[in-house]
Structure formats: structure tokens, C-alpha cells
Curated annotation (Swiss-Prot):
The keyword Zinc does not apply. This is Nucleoid-associated protein YejK. The keyword Transmembrane helix does not apply. It comes from Salmonella arizonae (strain ATCC BAA-731 / CDC346-86 / RSK2980). The gene is yejK. GO terms for molecular function: double-stranded DNA binding; single-stranded RNA binding.
């Protein structure tokens, strides 16, 4: 992995009681040793693989103002990180659920792009077996479950300040209030809505195949083709590009897919991040509620699975063997 650390600082917030978070600040930057580089590379890998929301700094963002001064050389990175950790502590004390953690600020370069990564990591206790096969206590950073993380694409921020996607952050699993406090600390608001872009793409694909008057099998083949392209981009950590997707679909219609989306007003960006959960709808139907969960391949609709919209009834012909076995045992006396 071609990752180069420019500067990295660690500080700590320790929760002493419900009202107080103790601030522990380092007096020097971390040296980018092999271990430190490995840790940042792992954090970069884990973060890149997760679904993220996109944002931009508000005009009054204190963090953005301080970062701008630091980038201009008016403040060193350590002082910037110490002051920012203090602001984070002040923001956290507003919330009764707030916990402490290791606060990381890392300025690094990956594939010719400069980033600032900000994270709050849990420092967990565990056990290790030493060379004498004795068990000793140890501590480790819980990188795999890190959920309070944001990353600023410094290159994008400085070269394209009107962008709505230079700031990314994790959102959802940690709960709305946690996401709120971190956004308040960053002084940021949501920008590009990746889910909305992906939903628009799915609708455009369906409309595109309908206008081309494709039959059911042909439409499903196009959906699988789009899914394959988008999934490859997702796995590679790259964005969906309308022009390259249009080339993939060049045989569907005389009108290119990119021209179609522009003419019909879908308001899709030239490129946008792939959203895994939304893209699954290209090949599967899934839903849950009221104690019922259903998930099946899209190609089965109209063949083994039939939906009557008038009565909102789903009819399944041929149940999976393991489900059929459970039903038979339960209805024959519960044996």
C-alpha cells in the first residue's frame, strides 16, 4: 500500500465520571515507525471499505478555520491537534452518553491525494500468550469497529472548495446522537447524498431499458451488467462513472445511457460513490417488517414468485428444502 504519513498525533480523553472528561495531550508528534504506518494503513483500509456519508464544512467551522491556518504554516500540526482535541472534549461533555477514547489526527498521502483522518478509537483490554506460553494482559486499538471517524480530502478541499464531497464520515450504526456530536465538532453538514445518487441510477436503468423496449430477460441481463460494473468499482474503492457505464451499455440503445440520463433530468453526478445496499436491488428483492423477512433473486419474480398488487399478495411456488422441512415438522405435531 502506497501510504506515506506526513504527521500524526495521538491524544486521549478519559471519562472519570458522568460530568467530566479528562484531557491527556501528547507533547510531541508520533514518529512514523513501521508499526505506526501499519496501524494507519489498517485504519485507512477499514475506513475505505465502509459505507460513508459525504459532507462539507460550514462557513463558521472552527476546525476548518484552524486547519486552514495550519495548512498555511501559521500553526504547527501538534498545536492544531491539541486545540482540536480540546474542542472535541468540550463538545462531548454536552452529551451524557459520551465516552472517552484515543483521539487520532493523521495527515497522510495515498495515491497522490492528501488526507486528514480524524478518529476516536477505543483502547480495549485483552489477553496475550507470550513466548513462554504464559497469559498476560494487553491493550489494543479496536480499529475494526471504529465508528467515530471522518476524513478530509485535503487535495479536493483546496483545489475545489465548492465540492460537496471532500469530507466523509461514518454514519448510521453508532446512532444519530453520536453522529450529531461529531458533525458539530467538525462544523460540517451533509453534502452529496450517495444513496440518492444510487437510487436515481437504479430508476434510470429501469427507464432506459423500458424505453429501449427490452423484454424481461433482456432487462434483467442489463441490471446484472450494471450491478457487475458497479460492484467492481465498489470493490476497487473507485466511484461509478456515467461515461464508462455508458460504454458498458452501448449495445442496449442507439442513445447512450449518459445522454439519456441528462435528457431525462435524473440529476446524476458524472461520478459518485457506489452504495452497496442500494445496488443489491439490481439483482434482488428484499424487505422485512411485521415479523416477516423476504429476500429473493429478481429473476424469480414472475417465474416462481408472483405478486398481485391489487391484493398485495406474494405467491411462492416451490419453497426452499430447509424451510419446507421446518414447515412439515411443525405442522405434523412439532416433532
Amino acid at each position: 500500500m502506497s501510504l506515506d504519513i506526513n504527521q500524526i498525533a495521538l491524544h486521549q480523553l478519559i471519562k472519570r465520571d458522568e460530568q467530566n472528561l479528562e484531557l491527556v495531550l501528547r507533547d510531541s508528534l508520533l514518529e512514523p515507525t513501521a508499526t505506526v504506518v501499519e496501524m494507519v494503513a489498517e485504519l485507512h483500509r477499514v475506513y475505505s471499505a465502509k459505507n460513508k456519508a459525504y459532507g462539507l464544512f460550514n462557513e463558521e467551522s472552527e476546525l476548518a478555520q484552524a486547519l486552514r491556518l495550519q495548512r498555511q504554516g501559521e500553526e504547527d500540526f501538534l498545536a492544531f491537534s491539541r486545540a482540536a482535541t480540546g474542542r472535541l472534549r468540550d463538545e462531548l461533555t454536552k452529551y451524557p452518553f459520551a465516552d472517552g477514547g484515543i483521539v487520532l489526527f493523521c495527515h497522510y498521502r495515498y495515491l497522490a491525494v492528501e488526507y486528514l483522518l480524524v478518529a476516536v478509537l477505543n483502547n480495549l483490554s485483552s489477553m496475550r500468550v507470550n513466548e513462554n506460553l504464559d497469559i498476560n494482559p494487553t491493550h489494543y486499538l479496536d480499529i475494526n469497529h471504529a465508528d467515530i471517524v471522518a476524513r478530509i480530502d485535503l487535495t479536493e478541499w483546496e483545489t475545489n472548495p465548492e465540492s460537496t464531497r471532500y469530507l466523509t464520515f461514518l454514519k448510521g450504526r453508532v446512532g444519530r446522537k453520536v453522529a450529531d456530536f461529531f458533525m458539530d465538532f467538525l462544523g460540517a453538514s451533509e453534502g452529496l447524498n450517495a444513496k440518492a445518487q444510487n437510487r436515481g441510477l437504479l430508476q434510470a436503468v429501469d427507464d432506459f431499458t423500458a424505453e429501449a423496449q427490452l423484454d424481461k430477460a433482456e432487462r434483467q441481463n442489463v441490471r446484472r451488467q450494471v450491478y457487475s460494473y458497479c460492484n467492481e468499482r465498489l470493490q476497487a474503492g473507485e466511484e461509478i462513472e456515467l461515461e464508462s457505464l455508458s460504454k458498458e451499455l452501448s449495445c442496449v440503445s442507439e442513445v447512450s445511457f449518459s445522454e439519456f440520463t441528462a435528457e431525462k433530468g435524473y440529476e446524476l453526478e458524472e461520478s459518485f460513490p457506489a452504495d452497496r445496499s442500494t445496488l443489491r436491488q439490481l439483482t434482488k428483492y428484499a424487505g422485512s417488517g411485521g415479523g416477516l423477512t423476504i429476500n429473493f433473486d429478481a429473476m424469480l419474480l414472475g417465474e416462481r414468485i408472483f405478486w398481485d398488487p391489487a391484493t398485495d399478495t406474494l405467491t411462492i411456488k416451490g419453497t426452499p428444502p430447509n424451510l419446507r422441512d421446518q414447515l412439515q415438522r411443525r405442522t405434523s405435531g412439532g416433532k
